[in-house]
A protein has these predicted regions:
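Glycine-rich "HGGG/HGxG" loop immediately N-terminal to the catalytic nucleophile
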Residues: 1-31
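Conserved acidic catalytic loop of the alpha/beta-hydrolase fold
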Residues: 21-30, 34-52
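Short beta-strand immediately N-terminal to the catalytic nucleophile in serine-hydrolase-like folds
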Residues: 54-56, 81
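Gly/Ala-rich beta-loop-alpha elbow adjacent to hydrolase catalytic centers
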Residues: 56, 60, 64
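Flexible "cap/lid" loop of the alpha/beta hydrolase fold
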Residues: 65, 69, 76-107, 149
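Alpha/beta-hydrolase
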Residues: 94-165
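Short beta-strand/loop motif that positions the catalytic acidic residue
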Residues: 169-170
């Protein structure tokens, strides 16, 4: 969100992160999905909510998985949408898209909206409504523009364990 910035953490080297992920090497990230899960639990605690229905999309789906695994008594139900379990062999981005997404120039404030639209066009496929998404992307960029934060989030995802076996008990 808008409350904490990690400028001192620097910018992850995304090419190194991607290659390390491909070859199963350890990835050092400024923070982890478990850290973000702890933050989410902190919000529930501050609202005095002991147990909740959790829903998350994409990285949010991974975060709710971490909560369900590590704090099952806090979860009424869990819904993980457009996400995966951390198994590098399944549920990732299609290989044909990786070359189009990795190594692209970092967006500037001026190019951020169109870059976001293009990224989602590549992921969504032929039925993507660019104009509708452009409005959403503009709202996102107007709220907060921090490409380094996105890179740190991608590093957090890449550095996280495979949760497949652990999720079978949820």
């Amino acid at each position: 969100g808008l409350s904490t910035w990690f400028d001192d953490a620097g910018e992850p080297n995304m090419n190194r992160t991607y290659l390390s992920s491909l070859f199963g090497r350890k990835i050092k990230a400024p923070y982890s999905l478990s850290d973000m899960a702890a933050d989410a639990l902190g919000v529930l605690d501050s609202l005095e909510i002991d147990k909740a229905h959790l829903i998350g999309a994409s990285m949010g789906g991974m975060i709710v998985q971490e909560i369900a695994i590590n704090h099952p008594t806090r979860v009424r139900t869990m819904c993980s949408i457009m996400s995966n379990t951390g198994d590098r062999r399944n549920g990732g981005i299609a290989a044909s898209l990786i070359s189009k997404l990795v190594g692209r120039p970092k967006p500037t404030l001026e190019t951020a909206v169109e870059d976001n639209v293009e990224t989602f066009r590549l992921i969504a496929g032929p039925h993507f409504d660019a104009e509708e998404h452009r409005e959403h992307a503009q709202a996102q960029v107007s709220r907060s523009f921090l490409p380094e934060g996105v890179e740190r989030q991608m590093s957090a995802i890449a550095s996280t364990r495979d949760r497949t076996t652990l999720l079978s008990s949820v």
